[in-house]
Regions:
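Conserved core of the sugar-phosphate nucleotidyltransferase
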Residues: 37-122, 129
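A short acidic, often aromatic-flanked loop/helix-cap motif at beta-alpha or helix-coil junctions
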Residues: 8-12, 65, 153-155
Length: 171
């Protein structure tokens, strides 16, 4: 079964619409531009998540010239994901997410729509309901875990021609 987001107002909204038709214990979402993500990383992250009690898990790799920068807390859980499209990243290198997220369906069905309605996850630049902002919000009170992958290509997303040139520099 397919669902459609009639108004392009962010990934959080797109995910929430999909959740209305989801009945599985877990759901998985991937950004459509994530051409570098390997099936091995997807499989390992799903297995990792399904054995955990985290509301969300995602793979991340250490790279230079990050698009996102993953910050962890003292217990190694997600503290925040910074996005270069929203703000200047303070570091040249660090953990970058891979655009793939494993999540607890019940938790997100219960909480994501309320968070969207509250307007707390509207991005400054795109004015869309941002799923990364939702993860950052939930990370303040719930366990979200990153799974390290050594495959830097897993982080590669292509939106523009210039992004293809990153293939040369990613290793």
């Amino acid at each position: 079964q397919y669902v459609f987001q009639n108004i392009a107002d962010g990934m959080a909204t797109a995910i929430e619409i999909g959740l209305r038709k989801t009945s599985t214990k877990f759901f998985y979402t991937i950004w459509c531009d994530q051409i570098g993500l390997s099936s091995k990383t997807v499989k390992e992250t799903i297995q990792y998540h399904e054995k955990s009690n985290f509301i969300a898990s995602f793979p991340a790799a250490r790279i230079k010239n990050n698009y996102t920068l993953v910050e962890k807390n003292k217990l190694n859980y997600l503290k925040k994901i910074y996005q270069s499209r929203e703000e200047k990243l303070g570091k040249n290198s660090g953990l970058n997410d891979c655009g793939f997220f494993c999540c607890d369906t019940f938790f997100f069905k219960k909480n994501l729509k309320k968070l969207i309605s509250s307007k707390k996850i509207v991005s400054k630049k795109t004015r869309e309901h941002d799923f990364i902002y939702a993860l950052n919000y939930f990370a303040k009170s719930y366990k979200i875990k990153k799974k390290i992958t050594k495959n830097k290509i897993d982080t590669l997303g292509v939106n523009f021609k210039k992004d293809i040139l990153k293939l040369k520099n990613i290793s």
